Structures are given as structure tokens and as C-alpha cells.
Amino acid sequence: MEDMTVEVRGSNGAFYKGFVKDVHEDSLTVVFENNWQPERQVPFDEVRMPPLPDIKKEITEGDEVEVYSRANDQEPCGWWLAKVRMMKGEFYVIEYAACDATYNEIVTFERLRPVNQNKTVTKNSFFKCTVDVPEDLRESCSNENVHKEFKKAVGACRVYFHAETNQLIILSACESTVKRVNILSDMHLRSIRTKLMLMSRNEEATKHLECTKQLASAFHEEFIVREDLMGLAIGTHGSNIQQARKVPGITAIELDEDSGTFRIYGESAEAVKKARSYLEFVEDFIQVPRNLVGKVIGKNGKVIQEIVDKSGVVRVRIEGDNETKLPREDGMVPFVFVGTKENIGNVQVLLEYHIAYLKEVEQLRMERLQIDEQLRQIGMGFRPSSSRGTEKEKGYATDESTASSVRGSRSYSGRGRGRRGPNYTSGYGTNSELSNPSETESERKEELSDWSLAGEDERESRQQRDSRRRPGGRGRSGSAGRGRGGSRGGKSSISSVLKDPDSNPYSLLDNTESDQTADTDASESHHNTNRRRRSRRRRTDEDSSLMDGMTESDNASVNENGLDDSEQKPQRRNRSRRRRFRGQAEDRQPVTVADYISRAESQSRQRNLPKETLAKGKKEKVKDVIEEHGPSEKVINGPRASSADKASNPQTASTERNQASCQDGSKQEAIMNGVS
């Protein structure tokens, strides 16, 4: 403000020092030194510029000078006009010209100066410029020290901010200042803004330094977050940091972005830990068994998505087999989770529980499979279907152990049409004494081995025929049904004729056609039958049994027609095949009434035989039974064939036996048990 110093003439004629604050059309706003007078506007003709400071002081006696003095103690000093009367050394005797009465005073050389030759100021003595200040810079522009460099650059006398007009005022005594202001005003405002920002940062740094000094003795924690997780820790627009700062008791949170270090300061350890839980993001992995990966993920990722939602983790990733970043155990697949430490702990609990649950379910499933396997193995013991092929290959050589194992604990004695009870008397006159336990056991062996060796289709057709011939149900000893131990209707069977020779033999011819029709129809229905019921098929009267074969011919196996009985009725193993071709055999050998009459006479002769003959016949019958179940089979009146040959080609063997029996019966007469 010294550059705008002026001298204002007072009422007493002295000039007092003042400062120009503003320039008007015809006056100046002047502020006096030390404010001994209030600020006021002074006309141009009462204001002059001070003399230059480098003027040489050459004062001699009689020169007019100006003395820096005051009239009284209440007024400040001013320049008064005077005249030098005498000088002695450094002291001068002056006489004031302003006063009417002469007033002399002795002064030193420092209080004297030559008379100021400057005239009063005019309108063109000062130049004024104004610059509009933005709102954000008004506060900073109020400080005159901010414009120090600008003032020096433009050559202004004074630069200050006017609060009423919000303008920056530049005052100068040079006209060139106006041009410079127009050039530098924008740059000056921009520099003010930059300096303001820097100053604000410095102030924050100063405050932070003070806070750091205060918090040095308080609670604080420091942790590092990985660079790739820094974005998650900061959050969207710094949401996580703001949330952590809102925790009660948190005083400051610092972040070093270069190293990824967070520093949290708080009033208590609990507040610091809570704020840390919001900011500390980590990555961790959990090993999952490979066989449970699919179940952990779930269909369309439903299970793993539920785990992620409940735990709060940010993301999950399954480590591939080709990736080797994480340590991997044998048979395990790493699941990588990203989130806060609390979220990682939650997902670990959920995943471990789910894996334990899956293992328990798998263990229960394996136990169920073991139980099912044991049940399947136990069930196979009652089903000899798996050994069916081997039994077919064995033929008639099935031993007693095999038969008993197939038969199991089930007893077949006394059941079925072909089974004879202990009190059964054959129609051929054989009483119960002839059927001993050995014969019954042999009969069981033969039936089981023959039945297991028969084909599936033969069993079904045989079962169908049996079911077709049971119109009366399964009552016990019923006359019209198939009861246990009962016959199949005595009027239509050969056994009924043999039992009662005196009856009408022509009644059999009436029922032959219906019997054949029943056999034919039975093969076309009832295909779905039970395996066990098939294995216990009841023997029909047409099926020859061991006991029937022994009692029908006590003397020999040759009937009255000259045919070998053992070859006319081959082994029961080929029973189904024999029935299949029975129509052809019946065409070759039709049944006549004479056959039944001759058979009845033979039966009557057998009843009249002596006891010795019967005993001899009994021994021969036992011998035949042993030969039939032995390794080699001996045919008395027919061609010899092994069991394997019969099993391999039963159809051919049956046909050959029928032909051979016809030839042998016509050429020679066999003798057995002494009876021709």
C-alpha cells in the first residue's frame, strides 16, 4: 500500500500522509496513517504525490524547506512549510511561514526536506481495473498476499478484493498496467485455484499428522489385501470404506494403494475388528472328494448357489485338473472361494456339513446294495435255473446228492397224481409189499432228473395239458377232479380197464378222441405258470412210473402184442418228445379191443402164479431198477444206447426204439421171469 501513498492537505495547510483506497470520478478514497482520521473521500486538488525518495538534500540558509512537525500533541506529524534562518552544524533554525506570528524552532537535518514540487493529482493521475472473481475463489481472493506476484507482474500500485461487488480491483499510476491486467487476469485466477487446492491438501495433511500423533497411542490394526481383491475391499464408489468408517468408535481409516495396506484406528479393539471385517477380503479353497463334486454342485448349480447365497461369498471357482496353482490331494478337487474372512468361515461350515451328509447317504446306499446282494444270493439257492444247462448235460447220471439238493427240504411223497401212497394197490394186482423205500427213492430221482432235463417249452406244454385236464379242481380223491391219490376218471383210462377186466372194453374207444383233443388244446393255453408248480407237476395216468412198470409186467417186459414194453415206453426224459410224435406212433400201431382183452387175461394169470414165481419176479424187478439208474443202461429186448446218446438226440432214439421193438417183437419172443 506504500506505492499508493499520497499527501493530503489539511485545514492548517500542512500535508499529512495517507493511502489511496479507491479512485472515483473527482475524488479519492483515502485512509490516513494510524487512522488518526476516519476514512474519507478527498478531492483531487487537496491531494498530491509525495516526492521521490532519492532527492538530494542540499539546504542552505534562506532556502524554503518543509519541516516534519506537528502543532500539538493530539495531531500527527505533517509537513509544514518553513524557511531556514540559520544553520550551525547539523542543527537548523527555521521559521514557519504558515503562522502569522513568527515562530522559530531548532530542528535536525533529518526533519527537513526540500519543498515538494509535485502538483495536486488529477483524473488521469490514477488508473483502475476490475476483474470478476468466481464464487469458489472469492474467499481466497480476499487475502491480498495471494495477489502479490500478480501485482508485481502488472506493475499495479494496489490489488485487492471488493466484497460488495465481488470484483478484484487493480489500481495503478501507469497506463500499461491496464493492458497487462487483461492479459494475466485469467491465468491469475487459474493459479489461485491451483494454489487453493494445494493449500487445502496441505491443511488436510497437517490435520492428519496431528491425528496420527494422537492415535499413535490408540487401538489400530494393519493388514494387506491382495491387489486383485483391492476393488472388492474398496467397494463400489468406496462403499465398503464408508461403511467401515461409520462403525462407532472408528477415528480414521488409511489406505496405501501402492502396497494394498489398510490401517484402521479406533477407540476400542472391538470397533477396529468390526471395521476390519468389512475390508479384509481373502481367497481360500476347500478340498471336495471327486466322486461328490457333481452332488455338491447340484442340478444346474442349485446346491452350490444356495451355499454361496447363504455364506455371502463373492464368487466360487472350481480348480481344473490342468491347473496346479493350489496343492491338490489324491481324489480331491479344490473349490476356491473369494470373500471376507467371515464369509469364508460360513462357506466352510456349510460345505463340510453337506459333504458329511453326502458321505452318510453314500454309506447307507452301499449298505442297501450289500443287503440286496445277500438277498439275491439267498434267493438263488431255491432256484436251480442257473444249473439247468449242466443238468441237461448230465442226463440220467444225476446222483442222489444232486437230486436231494435240487429237491431241498420240500417233500414230494404222497403228492401228485403219479405218486403212490404207502397203501396204494396197483391195478395190475401188485400190493403194498412190492413198493419198498428203495423203489420210492429211485422213483423220485428219476422224476427230478427227467423234469430238470426237459426243455422249457416242454414243461410249459406239459403244465398246460395238466391244467386242461383238471376241470374239477384239486380236491382230495374226488371222482370228477384230480385229487391227491385219485385217478383221472376210471372210465377213460387203460388202468380202469385193467383193474376191472369184466367191464365193457369198448367204452375206452369213445373217450380216446376226447383225450387226444384235450392234449392238443392244452398245449395252446396257460403259458404263464409258476416255476415251483411246474417242478411239482402231477403225474398223469399216461406217464409211466417205475412202480407201474414193475407191477404191470411181473414176468417180462413183452406184452401180448409182441412189443417190448420198455421200448414202447422210452425214458421219461424224452416224454415231451414222445408225446410230440405220438400221433405218428398211434397211426402205426392202432389200439384194438383184442389188446385190452389179452392184457386182462395176462393180469389174471399173474394173480394165479405161485409165490416162488412172484418172489423171483420181485428180485428181477429190483435188478432192473439198479440197471436203469446205473452208469450203463441194459435193454433186454431192444437196441442198446448210452444215456449221452439218448440225451443228444432223443427224437431219433425214440423213433429207432419204436421200430426196433416192432421188429424184435415179430421175429423173436422174449422170456422174462419164466413167462412168455
Curated annotation (Swiss-Prot):
Bias type Gly residues, positions: 474-489
Q: Which biological processes are named by the entry's GO terms? A: animal organ development; dentate gyrus development; membraneless organelle assembly; midbrain development; mRNA destabilization; mRNA transport; muscle organ development; muscle structure development
Q: Where is the composition biased (Basic and acidic residues)?
A: 609-632
The keyword Repeat belongs to this UniProt entry's keyword annotation: yes
- For bias type Acidic residues, the affected ranges are 512-522
Location of the Agenet-like domain: 4-50, 63-115
Q: What cellular component GO annotations does this protein have?
A: cytoplasm; cytoplasmic stress granule; intracellular membraneless organelle; neuron projection; nucleus; presynapse
A Pfam family annotated for this UniProt entry: FXMRP1_C_core
User: Which residue ranges does the record assign to the KH domain?
Assistant: 222-251, 285-314
- Residue ranges, compositional bias (Polar residues): 423-439, 645-665
What InterPro entries would the database entry show?
A: Agenet-like_dom (IPR008395), FMR1 (IPR040148), FMR1-like_C_core (IPR022034), FMRP_KH0 (IPR040472), FXR1_C1 (IPR032172), FXR_C3 (IPR032177), KH_dom (IPR004087), KH_dom_type_1 (IPR004088)
Q: Where is this region: RNA-binding RGG-box?
A: 471-486
Q: Where is the signal peptide?
A: none
Q: Which SMART domains match?
A: KH (SM00322)
Keywords in UniProt for this one? Answer: Cytoplasm, Developmental protein, Differentiation, Myogenesis, Repeat, RNA-binding
Q: Where is the composition biased (Basic residues)?
A: 528-538, 571-582
Q: Where is composition skewed (Low complexity) in this entry?
A: 404-414
Region CC2 domain: start-end pairs: 353-379
Q: Where is this region: Disordered?
A: 380-676
> Could you tell me which residues belong to the region CC1 domain?
201-208
Q: Name one GO molecular function term.
A: RNA binding
What family does this chain come from, according to its entry? Belongs to the FMR1 family.
Please give the function described in this protein's UniProt entry.
mRNA-binding protein that acts as a regulator of mRNAs translation and/or stability, and which is required for various processes, such as neurogenesis and muscle development. Specifically binds to AU-rich elements (AREs) in the 3'-UTR of target mRNAs. Promotes formation of some phase-separated membraneless compartment by undergoing liquid-liquid phase separation upon binding to AREs-containing mRNAs, leading to assemble mRNAs into cytoplasmic ribonucleoprotein granules that concentrate mRNAs with associated regulatory factors.
Q: What is known of its domains?
A: Disordered region at the C-terminus undergoes liquid-liquid phase separation (LLPS) for the formation of a membraneless compartment that stores mRNAs.
Q: Which PANTHER family match?
A: FRAGILE X MENTAL RETARDATION SYNDROME-RELATED PROTEIN (PTHR10603), RNA-BINDING PROTEIN FXR1 (PTHR10603:SF6)
Its protein name is: RNA-binding protein fxr1-A
Query: Which species does the entry assign this protein to?
Result: Xenopus laevis
User: Which classification does the entry list for the species?
Assistant: Eukaryota, Metazoa, Chordata, Craniata, Vertebrata
